[in-house]
């Protein structure tokens, strides 16, 4: 496979939008519930095998970078950490149908859209690599992770070793409270997809049971607490049982892109 790095000027962005009107477009992100994601992945695989649809585009988040077995002739990935870029490249020509598969790494800096937070740190670590680095070389990946975790000391940014360093004062309880493998302030919301609303009615009638909650997990979307508060302010959320929330405004969940955090009522008012 090969990589190309391109800077995307604003004129090319608008041109790409026009070109993308051709063919079939599908979306994949965690704003879709697991059942919706699974259905879309099955649809993508079927379309890629169907020769009557020569152009199939999937606009996706990092969701596709691990554990999603789909094969495209070309991949475009916004600049990010080297590990994420290689994961995205793994969806390109993975079945070897073409002689070479190409992954384009593009920058939206001209659009003032640059990575932030953890993505910014990962992207900067990649940019610190020598310009002639072979991204497929394992030693390059070793150097990348050194840049990411060792130079900036981001591997232990919670300073966990401070609580576990002194054998005479091992603060296990404090370390346990501070440790988070994944920083997660998510609130789960049951959305309207498939037979989810029928299951919600059963939940109201029969109460919370393990088999029922296991079924409902397929129709759940996790959002940050700040986004959850937005949806509550729109009047789009109902607490059906303590700690169990349902998206009651069906317009907030789109059949193509999943849960929307925008206030569609405000948009409708602006259109009047």
Question: Where is each model-derived feature located?
Answer:
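Conserved RecA-like ASCE P-loop NTPase motor core of nucleic-acid helicases/translocases
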Residues: 1-4
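Beta-edge loop/turn motif
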Residues: 55-64, 68-72, 187-192
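Structural motif
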Residues: 57, 74, 102-104
